[in-house]
Amino acid sequence: MMTQPNLNIVPFVSVDHMMKLVLRVGVETFLKELAGYVEEDFRRWQNFDKTPRVASHSKEGVIELMPTSDGTLYGFKYVNGHPKNTRDGLQTVTAFGVLADVGSGYPMLLTEMTILTALRTAATSAVAAKHLAPKNARTMAIIGNGAQSEFQALAFKAILGVDKLRLYDLDPQATAKCIRNLQGAGFNIVACKSVEEAVEGADIITTVTADKANATILTDNMVGAGVHINAVGGDCSGKTELHGDILRRSDIFVEYPPQTRIEGEIQQLPEDYPVNELWEVITGRIAGRKDARQITLFDSVGFATEDFSALRYVRDKLKDTGLYEQLDLLADPDEPRDLYGMLLRHEKLLQSESTKPAA
């Protein structure tokens, strides 16, 4: 673990540091190891404070805070979702996060989480699919080839062995980008001209679109028996990707029902519609995939424990790397009750420095 020589100093992981860390570890290794942390925290689900994320909605998008604690550590993520940003040359999702010590309340880590969120989302999807997808699934359709598509592909390759991709996006340039970025990664890739073509022969269907709308990306006639659906695009009220008939045919698995009923595909269904919780599958309390013809649906919206897992993982991986800055973030007077005195002493220091003769 990193040492903090002064209590005012908090390790800060910039975007540059995060990219260097991911590349040093290796993207697929990073995803596999991160998935291990995610699964570990789902196994101790009962230890966590859980609440739906705190959201501020506007017609342009949403800004959210995602907090949780296991009683020893506290973590939160600030994240936005603004689908229109792509038209303005901006990311649809940006994020940063904090990990803190519950005992003192002092932050232990401040880090970028735009890249890290894409990695943790993909790792979580692959963890769910490990328990829900057909045995020996090798072919995945990805509907929506934007910023998260490559991460999803690489996570499913690293954790499930998926090596055949069928890609579709309304924007052919997005598909071309995805193919270009995954060259040499060990995939057999087919660019498709429609959703119907993309899902043909797929064991797993991933939907990861960005539009903030009740869209119907996938209709019931496109989904055959035995398929696992990884529905990633839903993350706020009023944003869906699947036709309701698909939900009624599927066994639905969610992260945290109170949040998913607001933001996920199941917002289309009655509030008491039965769903299964992913942590119960991972811990063996309930069965995941029961037979070869079962349609399983992971209604993923992202939950705070996954960000907590990602923050823990990054904290642990930073040891001896030097891939962080020492950020002077916290006021730490010698006498904890004398915060104003600290300000006065600094004023004197500035005055003495200003009267020093120039060298």
Swiss-Prot record:
SUPFAM superfamilies documented for this protein: NAD(P)-binding Rossmann-fold domains
EC number: 4.3.1.12
Positions that bind L-ornithine: 53, 77, 120, 235, 301
Active site annotation, chain numbering: 235 (proton donor/acceptor)
Top EC class, one word: lyase
Pathway terms, separated by semicolons: Amino-acid biosynthesis; L-proline biosynthesis; L-proline from L-ornithine: step 1/1
MF term (GO), any: ornithine cyclodeaminase activity
Binding site for NAD(+): 92, 120, 147-148, 169, 209, 232-235, 239, 300
Catalytic activity of the protein: L-ornithine = L-proline + NH4(+)
Single Gene Ontology BP annotation: arginine metabolic process
Signal peptide annotation: none
Entry-linked Pfam families: OCD_Mu_crystall (PF02423)
Lyase among keywords: yes
Cofactors: NAD(+)
Keyword Protein biosynthesis: no
Assigned keywords, A-Z: Arginine metabolism, Lyase, NAD
PANTHER family given in the database record: KETIMINE REDUCTASE MU-CRYSTALLIN
Family: Belongs to the ornithine cyclodeaminase/mu-crystallin family.
Function according to Swiss-Prot or TrEMBL: Catalyzes the conversion of L-ornithine into L-proline with release of ammonia.
Protein name, UniProt field: Ornithine cyclodeaminase
Organism per entry: Brucella abortus biovar 1 (strain 9-941)
Record gene name: ocd
